[in-house]
């Protein structure tokens, strides 16, 4: 649903029409279209205002930057209202699946088509950018699918082999096959643990 709202093109969904109707009581109505437009407009406004805040900050206008950011947060909440009405927020597994489907559409269809059109119209540099972003979207899809697999296999906080687990709150390290239920240092719950990434 998110992809259709943002890019106005129906992606390949992994949910049935019946499920969609249960989640979205507005399906097939003009009100649904209005909610989609409201969600898209508020989402785009939020992003624009964060970009505008960066410019104001660089130009030395802290108050204006803060107001842009404050308004962006308001727009985020407005967008969330409409997205919830559309039944667009599921549980984490559903959200990962929806996100993966959206990223798949972006790299396999949307950006590929945009690049082809830009190329035909003589915008070779832009076509190259579309292709570069498509490669990033492919990686996003892979990441969401890997996280979904971890969730489905109950491997978010436990693995069959020894791993180094790091608390995202305080940095406490645990070596073992699973993350502790509670961090022994800061008492944050297991949800704050992840497999330590050493990419430096």
List each language-model region with its residue ranges.
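Non-heme di-metal
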Residues: 17-200
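Short, Lys/Arg-enriched N-terminal segments with co-localized hydrophobic residues
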Residues: 4-20
